[in-house]
């Protein structure tokens, strides 16, 4: 039985976005390269580490708000560098203060510095507090479908399972768990971490993910601005392929042209 899919808008916290690519601001050579790469990506949502980014609180240093306009981009402050729930909640509150009541946040609570794997126990604790305080929580998590379900039940607006370790570029390590998460999901699912090149982004979208977030894959490319544009097209191609529906896989060949009516 064939499945006919119709596209649906990509909506986060009541706002509709045209681009399904979200990008980070770290690891670039300078702010100018950051600006050019983000422009080339076509992304509308930009994430940054609250604890590592100057939003004007440090005089005399490059200010992200002077490079990327809040009128053009939706900012997604994240809690990168936090290792427990208390620290993560405090960081989100700081982001809200620095951005004049901004409620959209990306929650990350890390387990250790070697793997940067999510500490799901602390993540669940932080998510409960943040949702109660009125934050719109997008949450970095493992590819465990049960944890993803629990985060959705808490009230997170999107789950962001890793495809591979942060900054590893390993690609989609476990597509099967992602498929289970997608089958159960009632909120947007975004691949977060592990993407290394355009084909990884396309595969993520072909699986049915709503969007992909990346930073290292662009910033660490030999030509980041060119890679940013490649990622833009990869996301679109993957989404269209998902909607179109791939052909069935077969063990043996199947001729493109029928044998009936051959010229003899």
Swiss-Prot record:
Pathway: Cofactor biosynthesis; thiamine diphosphate biosynthesis. It catalyses: [ThiS sulfur-carrier protein]-C-terminal-Gly-aminoethanethioate + 2-iminoacetate + 1-deoxy-D-xylulose 5-phosphate = [ThiS sulfur-carrier protein]-C-terminal Gly-Gly + 2-[(2R,5Z)-2-carboxy-4-methylthiazol-5(2H)-ylidene]ethyl phosphate + 2 H2O + H(+). One of its GO terms (molecular function) is thiazole synthase activity. InterPro entries: Aldolase_TIM, Thiazole_synthase_ThiG, ThiG. It is an enzyme of class 2 (transferase). It is found in: Cytoplasm. The gene is thiG. This is Thiazole synthase. The active site is at residue 106. Homotetramer. Forms heterodimers with either ThiH or ThiS. Belongs to the ThiG family. Its EC number is 2.8.1.10.
């Amino acid at each position: 039985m064939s499945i006919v899919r119709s596209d649906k808008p990509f909506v986060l916290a009541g706002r509709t976005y045209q681009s399904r690519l979200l990008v980070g601001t770290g690891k670039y050579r300078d702010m100018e390269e950051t600006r050019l790469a983000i422009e080339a990506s076509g992304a509308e949502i930009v994430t940054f580490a609250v604890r590592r980014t100057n939003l004007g609180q440090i005089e005399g240093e490059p200010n992200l708000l002077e490079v990327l306009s809040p009128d053009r981009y939706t900012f997604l402050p994240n809690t990168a560098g936090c290792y427990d729930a208390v620290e993560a909640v405090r960081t989100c509150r700081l982001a809200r203060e620095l951005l004049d009541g901004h409620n959209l946040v990306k929650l990350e609570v890390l387990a250790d510095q070697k793997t940067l794997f999510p500490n799901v126990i602390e993540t669940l604790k932080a998510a409960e507090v943040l949702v109660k305080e009125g934050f719109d929580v997008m949450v970095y998590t493992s590819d465990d479908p049960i944890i993803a379900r629990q985060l959705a039940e808490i009230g997170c607006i999107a789950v962001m399972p890793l495809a591979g370790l942060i900054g590893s570029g390993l690609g989609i390590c476990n597509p099967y768990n992602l498929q289970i998460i997608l089958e159960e999901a009632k909120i947007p699912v975004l691949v977060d971490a592990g993407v290394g090149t355009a084909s990884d982004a396309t595969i993520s979208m072909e699986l049915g993910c709503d969007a992909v977030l990346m930073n290292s894959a662009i910033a660490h490319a030999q030509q980041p601005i060119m890679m940013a544009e490649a990622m833009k097209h990869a996301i679109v191609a993957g989404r269209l392929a998902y909607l179109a529906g791939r052909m069935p896989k077969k063990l043996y060949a199947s001729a493109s042209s029928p044998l009936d009516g051959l010229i003899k």
